[in-house]
Amino acid sequence: MASLADRVRGNGRIAAGLLLNLLVSICIVFLNKWIYVHYGFPNMSLTLVHFVVTWLGLYVCQKLDIFAPKSLPPSKLLLLALSFCGFVVFTNLSLQNNTIGTYQLAKAMTTPVIIVIQTLCYKKTFSTKIRLTLIPITLGVILNSYYDVKFNFLGTVFAALGVLVTSLYQVWVGAKQHELQVNSMQLLYYQAPMSSAMLLVAVPFFEPVFAEGGIFGPWSVSALLMVLLSGVIAFMVNLSIYWIIGNTSPVTYNMFGHFKFCITLFGGYVLFKDPLSINQGLGMLCTLFGILAYTHFKLSEQEGSKSKLVQRP
């Protein structure tokens, strides 16, 4: 009975963690879009707030022994911290200048770009099945963008830059974690303050600081509360992802990611009244099919590799 009770409590914790991640992951997209649409808060300044709040949150976490910080040489993290800035800034600019549907589908192009980077730069090979899944993913994104009535060139440029820098960042994070033998929270604990310092230097060159529309400009209390809430939720997204990866299987994490993908698309059209054509809907279904197929084949290959290792004498 005790073991049954423990399993029930464990499943309850996992369900609560998944629910929290679902809520904050969807909320951060809609809240940021709301801040851009209704308050016009500057993009890089919002990203800076996110980084500072994330670092403060991680500082509290390590004081509470949620994770143990590891001493890392800053010189080895400079490029990673810079790409972290670029990935968040360009992703937020894509959200600011595109519909939520186009923003969300553009992010799906990260997978094909990562595969191209790893193939060309790291000589990594992928099976034919994996490579074929890139066709529906890419085709769906192109279909959606082509038939998006709110399509704009600037939004497309930001989306493309966001995908490229995000892909580089994800590849480098994996390489750095392996090289330095650290987990994602230990790495982020050093990245966040370094990225904050970089943005602190860059913001005055691209955005007003004390004038109207700047981070220290005359904002309403509601705008400041929304920005602070956005920073807290951004931290909770990172924390909940770390917890889910550590307490569930890769299948659970990936399938849950697809569920969030669909909910975010649906919520964008409901909350922001973005128009949706039949061709856009087909593009979304095409991309979702490609993502599901990629996940299925990737996880099957990983399980096959584990089985071979276990059977090896």
Curated annotation (Swiss-Prot):
Keyword Membrane among record annotations: yes
Alphabetical list of SUPFAM superfamilies matching this protein: Multidrug resistance efflux transporter EmrE
Protein name: Solute carrier family 35 member E3
Transmembrane helix keyword on record: yes
Disulfide cysteine pairs (residue numbers): none
Membrane-spanning parts: 17-37, 40-60, 77-97, 100-120, 130-147, 153-173, 187-206, 225-245, 252-272, 275-295
Major localization listed first in the record, in broad terms: membrane
This protein's encoding gene: SLC35E3
Described purpose of this protein according to its UniProt entry: Putative transporter.
GO MF assignments: antiporter activity; nucleotide-sugar transmembrane transporter activity
Family indicated by similarity: Belongs to the TPT transporter family. SLC35E subfamily.
Protein species of origin: Bos taurus
GO CC term, one of those recorded: Golgi apparatus
Keywords associated with the record: Membrane, Transmembrane, Transmembrane helix
Organismal lineage: Eukaryota, Metazoa, Chordata, Craniata, Vertebrata
Location relative to the cell: Membrane
UniProt membrane topology term: Multi-pass membrane protein
